[in-house]
Regions:
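C-terminal segment of N-terminal export signals and the immediately downstream linker at the start
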Residues: 1, 18-49
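Extracytoplasmic beta-sandwich strand-turn segments characteristic of Greek-key/jelly-roll folds
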Residues: 57, 61-63, 88-120, 197-202, ...
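Hydrophobic or amphipathic alpha-helical targeting/insertion segments
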Residues: 114, 118-150
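Acidic-aromatic/histidine active-site loop/patch
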Residues: 161-208, 215-219, 337, 345-350
């Protein structure tokens, strides 16, 4: 943990400083976020008390330009120390937004100012990065999440309009399962903080090409989406363009994953964009897509199967690259220590639970392959901070060219990803399920 003196020294390098709100005069920030308690109306006369950014959830869209420095001021008006993680950005540990890397919390009643040059281009997001334990109102269970889009220097895009959509689950309760473990169930599931039919529709016109940026901000649950009468042409995963854009009938997003997809608006009417699983859509997860000059009850068409495959979007040639590039292999085995009887499990990487997991040293500039072996009965959406990795193998199938920062490793399977250690200092690796992270599913890499 970095003390204040060490942090201020790091600040001169990283471009951020922590101040009392009445401390120093600043030039106006490009963006201002205020963390505070609020009450959100998710359905008619149904309110959720939560913590959010700027009294809204999702928080405001932060739209940046690649390579153009920005300053963000974050004021914490909540009762708890807080922290903001800039998910998917390449930032120094002092401002990445993970206490485990050395980013300081923002104390209650204080402010922090972050100045950085945003990269890489693409659809990113920001969110809290604290522990929740058994309190299903805190951390990622809360409304502390928002969109962040970094526009590329030279590509204006080729679409008629775009929408940003956040999937979230609210008002969780821990319940016991047959194996004795405790898992959350939710009262409401929303898109952009509203249940199906309560929020404003996505208004479109026939012939338009609409770009959808979708992020799963749920603390624990994956989500399946379909748009009745239409298909999604997936063009980016986790904000990174895919080698082989393809049209699919449905999307699958684990916690923290993002999908950018084009939709050709070629079937006029009023449709439902919603969760494929009936019980989740019944909890509210959906939004109306309304063509101009059309009205009436939104139409839903229930898919008969659940289909999703990352590898559809990989390069046509999935063979191993030739050459003399050395790739260092790091095996990471995921399993759990069952506790049961109403208690939380302990999640482990290579037999250890954080903070006792090994900090693995990396050499700057070298290439590494992480070999994930999931020996547990749960799926794990694992996230590597401060890097983008290339997916190389999933469940025995090879691929190339798919760049992500979060990947779902299904129960009982193996996956492999590669990245170059190009970010000096500590980088956190963890499962993005809040309950798994809280119960020890974390470790650090140290690049020197």
């Amino acid at each position: 943990v970095v003390n204040r003196r060490q942090f201020l020294k790091l600040s001169s390098i990283a471009g951020t400083q922590l101040w009392n709100r009445r401390g120093f005069a600043f030039e106006p920030a490009d963006y201002s976020l205020t963390i505070a308690r609020t009450s959100l109306e998710v359905a008619s006369h149904r309110f959720i008390k939560t913590t959010a950014y700027n009294q809204q959830s999702p928080g405001p869209l932060l739209r940046m330009k690649e390579g153009v420095p920005v300053t963000i001021e974050v004021t914490n008006q909540s009762d708890d120390d807080e922290i903001v993680h800039w998910h998917g950005l390449f930032l120094p540990p002092a401002i990445d937004g993970a206490m485990e890397e050395g980013t300081p919390h923002i104390p209650a009643g204080k402010s922090a100012r972050y100045t950085f040059t945003p990269e890489p281009a693409g659809f990113r997001w920001y969110h809290t990065h604290t522990a929740a334990g058994s309190n299903l109102k805190k951390a990622l269970y809360s409304g502390q999440h928002g969109f962040l889009s970094i526009e590329p220097r030279n590509d204006p895009g080729r679409y008629d309009q775009e929408y940003f959509l956040a999937l979230h689950d609210w008002d969780g309760t821990l319940v016991g399962s047959d194996d004795g473990s405790m898992n959350p169930i939710y009262s409401y599931s929303t898109i952009n903080g509203k249940v199906l039919g309560f929020g404003e529709p996505l208004r479109v016109r026939q012939g338009q090409r609409v770009l959808l940026h979708i992020v799963n901000t749920s603390a624990t649950d994956p989500h399946w989406l379909a748009l009745a009468g239409h298909q999604f042409r997936v063009v980016a995963l986790d904000g990174n363009p895919v080698p082989s854009p393809r049209a699919v009938a449905m999307l699958h997003l684990s916690p923290a994953e993002r999908i950018t997809a084009e939709v050709e608006m070629n079937d006029p009417g009023v449709w439902v964009l919603g969760e494929v699983r009936k019980h989740v859509q019944a909890a509210g997860m959906g939004i109306v897509v309304e063509y101009a000059n059309h009205s009436g009850k939104p139409v839903w068409q229930q898919p008969q199967t659940l289909e999703w495959d990352y590898l559809l979007f990989g390069a046509a040639d999935a063979s191993e690259p030739s050459g003399d590039i050395k790739v260092n292999r790091i095996p990471l085995i995921f399993n759990s220590k069952f506790v049961g009887h109403g208690a939380m499990d302990r999640w482990m990487i290579n037999g250890r639970s954080f903070p006792d997991t090994e900090t693995i040293p990396l050499k700057l500039g070298q290439r590494y392959r992480l070999i994930f072996k999931n020996e547990s009965l749960d799926d794990h959406p694992v996230h590597l901070h401060r890097h983008t990795f290339e997916v190389r193998r999933m469940a025995g199938r090879t691929t190339r060219g798919i760049l992500k920062d979060t990947i779902l490793v299904k129960a009982g399977t193996e996956s492999e990803v590669e990245f170059t250690a190009n970010a000096p200092g500590l980088s956190l690796f963890h499962c993005h399920q809040q309950d798994h992270m809280d119960m020890g599913f974390m470790m650090l890499f140290q690049s020197t």
